[in-house]
Amino acid sequence: MSHQGKKSIPHITSDRLLIRGGRIINDDQSFYADVYLEDGLIKQIGENLIVPGGVKTIEANGRMVIPGGIDVNTYLQKPSQGMTSADDFFQGTRAALAGGTTMIIDHVVPEPGSSLLTSFEKWHEAADTKSCCDYSLHVDITSWYDGVREELEVLVQDKGVNSFQVYMAYKDLYQMSDSQLYEAFTFLKGLGAVILVHAENGDLIAQEQKRILEMGITGPEGHALSRPEELEAEAVFRAIAIAGRINCPVYITKVMSKSAADIIALARKKGPLVFGEPIAASLGTDGTHYWSKNWAKAAAFVTSPPLSPDPTTPDYLTSLLACGDLQVTGSGHCPYSTAQKAVGKDNFTLIPEGVNGIEERMTVVWDKAVATGKMDENQFVAVTSTNAAKIFNLYPRKGRIAVGSDADVVIWDPDKMKTLTAKSHKSTVEYNIFEGMECHGSPLVVISQGKIVFEDGNISVSKGMGRFIPRKPFPEHLYQRVRIRSKVFGLHSVSRGMYDGPVYEVPATPKHAAPAPSAKSSPSKHQPPPIRNLHQSNFSLSGAQIDDNNPRRTGHRIVAPPGGRSNITSLG
C-alpha cells in the first residue's frame, strides 16, 4: 500500500473512525458489518469490533457503506485558446468529494509538439498543491514526434503513469493517422499501458464544419450537426479494428451515442478487449438543448463527441451500462464560464468544449440506473468505482471495502432526494447542464484517507491534502487476457516443403516519364485520342500494288454464290 508523493499529511493519518451498523456494498457482495478506519486505511471489518478508546463513531443506521467513487475522466485547468477551464484542482476535487468521488484521474494535455514529460510535471505540480482528494494522471499524446517513445518509457517506468489518450479527431491539432495509431498502440502495448481513445472521424468533421458554416449556421446547433453520431461510431469501429490486429486493450472515452455503444457491445461479444465509458452527461441529459433559443444555455452543452439529439439515448446507454456492455462512468468534467464560451458566439467551432459532472456523476448514475431497477447496488459500485480501479491498476487499494484498502468510504443514502442546480453546486461556473433534475441517491458522509471531508451537506477540505497515486503498468484485469491470447491465437507460419518448380521471370518495368505538353495543346487540358473515321480506308486500287508480280487467274463467271441463291423477300 505504499505510494510515492511529495508530502505527508499528519493530521489525516491520526484520525480513527468507526462506522457502525452499515451495510457494506462491494461489486460482488453485500453484508452487514462495522468498519474501523485508522491511519488512512481500513483496519477491521466485522461485528463487535475491539477498537481503541477515543474513536469517533458514525452511526450508519443500516445505510449503504460503499467504496469512494473514482472519476477517471476529468480536465481540470485544461488550456484552450489561451484560457483554462473554469475549475482548478482545488475547486474541481472539492466538488468531486461533495458528490461522493474520492479519487480522480485527470488528463495532462500537452501543447502539440511539446514535451510530454514537461507537461506531466506541470500538471503534477498544480494538482499536488491544490487537490483535495487523491488523484492520478493520464497523459494525452497530442502529437507523434521523434523522441516521444523515450518519454513514454520514462512516464511509465519512473513517473507512475500507465494510461495514455490518443485522438482520432481535432484535425491539424491532435489528430493521429491510422498508421500513427497502429504505431502508438503497438508501442504502448509493449509498455503495458492502457490506451484511451477519443473516437471521432476528424477528417469528415472538418469538412462538415466548413460546409455548415458556409450555410450560415454559426450557433451551438452547428456543433451537433457537424459531428453526427455516425462519425463517432465509425471511429470507434476503426479504433477497435486497429487494436484487434495488435491484440491490445483499448478504452473508448466519452461514449455519447447509441451507434458507438452498439459497436462496443458487438465487439465485446466477438472477443476484442474493448471497454466503454459513458459520462454523466450522456447518461443524464441529451443534445436537444443545442437548439435552445438561449445561446448561453445551448453553448453550455457543447462537448465532443456531442450529446446525442435523440432524447432516448440516455436510457439506452444506461441499459447497456447495466448489462455490462459498457463498464465505467466518468464525468468528462471540463466546464467553461459563459464568458469563455462566448468566444465562439459567432462561430461554433470556437466554443471551448466541456461540461460539468464531477459532482453529479454518482447521483445521476444511481437515479438513472438503480432507482429505475436497471441495475443493482453491486453493479452501481462496479461502474462508479471498482471497474475503474481494476482497469487502471488501482485495485484493491481503491474500489473496495476490504481490510488493507485505502479508507476512502462513502455512506450513501439511496432514498435521499437531491435537486441538481447551479445555485448549490460546488463548481465555479454559473450553469449546470442537469439544472432542475430531481434525483434519488446522495452521499451523507464522505471519508477521504480516513478523514471526514463531507457531512450533513458541509464540506471540510484544504488545498493540497490529496495525494498523487502512482499506477504500475500491465494491469492484470487487462493484460492477463492479452498474454493468454498471444499464446493461443498468435500468428504462425505454415511449415511446408521448399518449392523447386519453375519461377516466371518478371521483366523489369521501365519508369515512364510523363509526356511533355505539346505546343498545340494546353497543359491543363487532356487531349483525347483521335477517333478513326470508319468510312475511310488506306486501301487503294490505283498505282503499284504489292502483288503486281503474282500471276493472275482468268476470270470465271459465278453462277450462284456459295449456298445457293438468296431472296431477301422470301422467308420460306
From Swiss-Prot:
Bias-annotated ranges (Low complexity): 509-525
Required for interaction with FLNA: where is this motif? 246-247
* InterPro entries associated with the record: Amidohydro-rel (IPR006680), Hydantoinase/dihydroPyrase (IPR011778), Metal-dep_hydrolase_composite (IPR011059), Metal_Hydrolase (IPR032466), Metallo-dep_Hydrolases_sf (IPR050378)
Q: Annotated region Disordered: where?
A: 509-572
Q: What cellular component terms from Gene Ontology apply here? A: actin cytoskeleton; centrosome; cytosol; dendrite; growth cone; midbody; neuronal cell body; perikaryon
Q: Name one GO biological process term.
A: neuron development
Keywords, ordered alphabetically: Cell projection, Cytoplasm, Cytoskeleton, Nitration, Phosphoprotein
Q: How is it modified after translation?
A: Phosphorylation at Ser-522 enhances CRMP1-mediated alteration of FLNA ternary structure and FLNA dissociation from F-actin.
Could you tell me what this protein does? Necessary for signaling by class 3 semaphorins and subsequent remodeling of the cytoskeleton. Plays a role in axon guidance. During the axon guidance process, acts downstream of SEMA3A to promote FLNA dissociation from F-actin which results in the rearrangement of the actin cytoskeleton and the collapse of the growth cone. Involved in invasive growth and cell migration. May participate in cytokinesis.
**Family membership noted in the UniProt record:** Belongs to the metallo-dependent hydrolases superfamily. Hydantoinase/dihydropyrimidinase family.
Give the record's subunit note.
Homotetramer, and heterotetramer with DPYSL2, DPYSL3, DPYSL4 or DPYSL5. Interacts with PLXNA1. Interacts with FLNA (via calponin-homology (CH) domain 1 and filamin repeat 24); the interaction alters FLNA ternary structure and thus promotes FLNA dissociation from F-actin.
- State the protein's name: Dihydropyrimidinase-related protein 1
Q: Which organism is it from?
A: Rattus norvegicus (Rat)
Chain's gene name: Crmp1
